[in-house]
């Protein structure tokens, strides 16, 4: 058996450690770098890298690009047992335009379900991604698009394990850049494998392009020899639902602004530049030892500076821990419906947060639909409920027909039975397994649960602003809907994405942690 074949048989344990001598920082010292603070000068971050001259510019630098991402909800009743694959984009990032680089595309892999990733599926997906890397060798650098909250049976934090295995293939000298969602649960040991670690700074997310651009620029500067990135990850013992840490509300807005300031000005007492600073909220619906908030710093050549910046930001987050609250209007189910009906606004969006598909919940709970019908609400739209069998019944009946349907609770059965009632098939969406039905005064989109953008309504022939109430399966509204919603109320409904995380049956979370152990004390040093 060849070496590539043999390497496919390796195990992926949760405590995996890949040992490699890493590149020395630019001062030539051994890591961690020990600096003697000799100045209070605050130093700016890396200069733009686009067009930077690379050594030996006649030979393109080969950058392997791949993706491996998931926001795992371990409270989802079903495991994710399959991945979808696509070839990564082969075009240079905007930050690399004009530079002599060759993008070597690998695979992008993502689980097709929302629940805990099965061990076999994760192993297979990792091996496929790693095989494309082995085939691409030698490479000068690696660029990975990750999420940070993938959790697999028998493997644990799968994205961190993947980065470790990538390091074992490319060796200690090739820089590895990674981008993340700020809802990732980031293990401290990730910093031992990745060089350039950059996450989103906005929730709701509006800075994907900027995050990729920053990581790409730092990677190009690294290849040019103008920076030598080293990273530090510092976990913070706080678990919060993401809706309590939105960058549109305090205290998280100011905390992220401080991270931006650290990027611009550096950290007092250290001359090294801070190339990237990310505050991670974490994903509360992933039950794992790494679940929770953290700080991720990439500095130029000084692990001491990276650690100092991480400590500075972690202390500020910890001091603000009791101030975190929902960054949007919220209410219990009945109260939220009553507020919406009494609202002066022409349309009120209600988000069914417990069944939030953007937090990898099932998207098939009929709780809000049932209550709207029970209260004889008119002018409401539920967008939507995932229920393929109900859609098939509608397709067989045809538009304009009335039939008795059992809706929802096909996957998530822990929070009540399906909704049963007479439904009129209003419309069948062309070339899509989607049906729109009317039950009393409520219209329901069946077959697609994830409505996060106005374009999805348009594709179904719907104008959400023609309804008094629009129910979507989100927590906070994504930017596209937030931009059109006259008013939004987040319903505190049960489900795999329950915002009241104290009701979730954690078994693997760290202890002690705030707010579960409210008197938790911690010092960062």
Task: Annotate each language-model stretch with its function.
Residues 64, 68-70, 119-126, 136-228, ...:
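Active-site histidine-anchored catalytic micro-motif
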Residues 40-98, 107:
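N-terminal amphipathic/basic leader segments beginning at the initiator methionine
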Residues 55-60, 133-140, 336-348:
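Glycine-rich phosphate/diphosphate-binding loops that line cofactor/substrate pockets in enzymes
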Residues 127, 318, 430-525:
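Extended hydrophobic packing segments that form well-structured cores
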Residues 7-9:
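Intrinsic low-complexity, disordered N-terminal segments enriched in polar/charged/small residues
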Residues 212, 221-260:
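Conserved anion/nucleotide-ligand pocket segment
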Residues 243-440, 445, 449:
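Hard-cation-handling environments
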């Amino acid at each position: 058996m060849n070496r590539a074949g043999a390497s496919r048989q390796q195990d992926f344990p949760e405590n995996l450690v890949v040992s490699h001598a890493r590149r020395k920082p630019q001062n030539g010292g051994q890591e961690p770098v020990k600096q003697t603070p000799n100045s209070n000068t605050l130093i700016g971050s890396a200069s733009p890298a686009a067009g930077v001259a690379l050594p030996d510019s006649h030979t393109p630098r080969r950058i392997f690009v791949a993706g491996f991402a998931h926001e795992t909800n371990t409270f989802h009743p079903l495991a994710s047992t399959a991945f979808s694959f696509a070839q990564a984009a082969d075009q240079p990032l905007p930050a690399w335009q004009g530079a002599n680089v060759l993008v070597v595309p690998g695979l992008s892999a993502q689980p097709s379900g929302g629940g805990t990733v099965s061990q076999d599926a994760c192993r297979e997906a990792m091996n496929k991604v790693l095989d494309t890397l082995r085939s691409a060798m030698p490479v000068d650098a690696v660029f990975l698009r990750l999420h940070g909250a993938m959790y697999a049976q028998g493997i644990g934090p799968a994205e961190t394990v993947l980065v470790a295995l990538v390091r074992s293939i490319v060796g200690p000298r090739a820089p590895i850049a990674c981008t993340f969602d700020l809802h990732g649960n980031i293990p401290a040991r990730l910093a031992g494998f990745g060089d350039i670690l950059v996450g989103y700074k906005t929730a709701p997310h509006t800075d994907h392009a900027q995050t990729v651009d920053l990581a790409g620029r730092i990677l190009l500067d690294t290849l040019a020899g103008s920076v030598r990135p080293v990273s530090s990850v510092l976990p913070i013992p706080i678990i919060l639902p993401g809706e309590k840490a939105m960058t549109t509300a305090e205290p998280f807005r100011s905390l992220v602004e401080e991270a931006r300031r650290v990027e611009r000005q550096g950290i007092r007492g250290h001359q090294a530049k801070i190339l990237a600073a990310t505050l991670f909220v974490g994903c509360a619906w992933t039950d794992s030892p790494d679940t929770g908030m953290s700080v991720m710093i990439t500095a130029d050549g000084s692990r001491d500076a990276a650690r100092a910046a991480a400590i500075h930001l972690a202390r500020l987050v910890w001091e603000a821990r009791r101030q975190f609250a929902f960054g949007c209007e919220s209410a219990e189910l009945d109260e939220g419906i009553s507020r919406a009906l009494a609202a002066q606004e022409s349309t009120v969006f209600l988000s069914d947060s417990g069944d939030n598909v953007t937090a990898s919940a099932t998207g098939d709970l009929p709780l809000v639909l049932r209550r709207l019908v029970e209260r004889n609400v008119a002018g409401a739209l539920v967008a939507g409920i995932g229920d393929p069998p109900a859609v098939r019944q509608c397709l067989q009946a045809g538009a304009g027909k009335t039939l008795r349907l059992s809706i929802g609770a096909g996957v998530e059965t822990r929070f009540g039975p399906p909704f049963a009632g007479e439904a009129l098939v209003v419309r069948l969406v062309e070339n899509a397994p989607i049906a729109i039905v009317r039950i009393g005064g409520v219209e329901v989109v069946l077959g697609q649960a994830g409505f996060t953008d106005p374009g999805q309504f348009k594709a179904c022939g719907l104008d959400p602003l023609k309804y008094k109430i629009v129910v979507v399966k989100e927590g906070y509204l994504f930017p596209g809907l937030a931009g059109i919603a006259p008013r939004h109320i987040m319903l505190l409904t049960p489900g795999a994405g329950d915002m009241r995380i104290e009701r979730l049956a954690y078994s693997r979370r760290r202890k002690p942690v705030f707010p579960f152990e409210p008197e938790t004390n911690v010092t960062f040093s």
